């Protein structure tokens, strides 16, 4: 596996990453059972992948939870990127319907706390906006909140 520095940091990141959306949902194929998902994550790591990309809404936190369970004792050996913005609390998603989005300060802080808890870590290497609309990108207050972390 080839590795590069992540931006201007000293973090070593694999050129290939593991996108963890599919281990939490079954929209376009066979459902992946949790034991199989954990084996997939471990196998990816054994093959040299140390970059795991997820999002809080993937299975309403399931993807993050699985990554946290597998790598809880190896946090310094992996790179985690997650994202937030969809408010899936108390909302039943029908098919591929759009969920409400929130990027305000209170929601951002709550989403971050919840992701850290599910991932069983005290920090993230990357934290992003999940599918923001143009009005969100133009809102400097969102980025001011993110910069405060």
Where are the model-predicted features located?
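N-terminal binding-site loop/beta-alpha segment at the start of enzyme catalytic domains
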Residues: 1-79
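Feature marks short, surface-exposed loop/turn motifs that line or immediately flank catalytic pockets
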Residues: 22-25, 58, 86-90, 130-133
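Secondary-structure boundary/capping motif
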Residues: 42, 46, 84-87, 107, ...
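Low-complexity, flexible helical/coil segments
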Residues: 50-56, 87-91, 117-119
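Generic enzyme active-site microenvironment
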Residues: 51-54, 81, 123, 128
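Hydrophobic positions in alpha-helices of CheY-like receiver
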Residues: 71, 84, 146-149
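A short, structured active-site edge motif that brings together acidic residues
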Residues: 77-89, 127
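Glycine/proline-rich, positively charged
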Residues: 91-149
